[in-house]
Amino acid sequence: LMKILLGVFIPLIIIIIILILLFVFRRRIPCLRALFTYKLPKTSTDLPPPIPIENFAANLKELSDKNGFHDLSQEMALLTITEVEDKYRLTKVAALQNGSRNRHNDMVPYDQSMVLVGRPWSTVLKDQEPRITVREVEKGYINASYVRRSEYGRRGEVLVSPFTTLPEYIAAQDPLESTVADFLTMVCEQRCPLIIMLSGHEEGGTEKCAQYWPGKETQTFTSENYSVVVRKESEESSGNVISRQLSIHPLGETSPWTVTQYQFMDWADHDVPDMESFYNLVIIHNKFLAKHHMGNEYGPTVVHCSNGAGKTGTFMVACFLLDRLRKNQQNVDIVGTVLATRKWRANLVQSWAQLQFLYNFIDFCIVRENLSGKSVTIRLPAASARKKKIPVIPFAF
């Protein structure tokens, strides 16, 4: 009898122990996986899969007719993209402790993707996942994040790139008066060849971005930890883009760093830009980077707006999507690309209007670049800048 009881209870006890262990550790497994590979989390919402190009126009029309972008944006906001939130606690705490350097304290970088002044691009090339100390954050904190390009599965679904993938962009808030020298030092240390500025100095009487280049020829900018001399080598305007060539010389460095800045003037807050002028900005950005390949000599492109999220995320995702569309004209995954990009900085593509703009941008590109699929024209929100046709910007590179 004893043998029978043991034969029954011992397997039962083992099964119970296994079930308990599975219950205890089931929430930890995704966190461990997230350190190596990251897949978009499953939720109760039914998010759209990658859209076949031949169905894109119909999909866009359906979403527009049903006011679907607002609902889709809310569904995306419910996703727990940052399921390893606990791992970002240090960064968020450190960022709030340096609140005077944040333009918006509700928009701060994550630990895994935070840019630090004092940690140059040469170091990033060797180690994409460093251990960051509190001391380093206290001196080198800046509200800026590395953003990596997404990868794609066999069916066209988006996968977040691992940390070993080099970041192509730095998403940053508009510099404050007190952080201009920090921002310029970051541009030099990261060997950034290009800055995309998506805001004006002021909008509605409110300062949006401290001017970090001289009004005339040369100006010195100083912060608590850094001092930088900036020389404006050239400035020209074409369409809605102002192009500037800046020479930045941090104190103590033997030679200056030259960077090109494109300031896009056709994007008011809480609005979307003219499609033609936005497309032209993407094109001149692509042409410039085609001659300044990222590697030992050049680092990421800096993209900045007021909070480094809404306009900045929209621009970066638009560039990712167009590049993907040119390489693979089978399908496009806008929702997946947005969610994957938010892994590196929260709230990228901040509003439903910006999400809708991305759909319209892809529709525009399908027709403009004679890609496969049919297009449908959707009226965008009215803006005075949209009344004029913007010519292709003829900057030399």
Where do the protein language model's features map onto the residues?
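Cys-based phosphatases of the PTP/DUSP/CDC25 superfamily and their flanking regulatory architecture
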Residues: 1-397
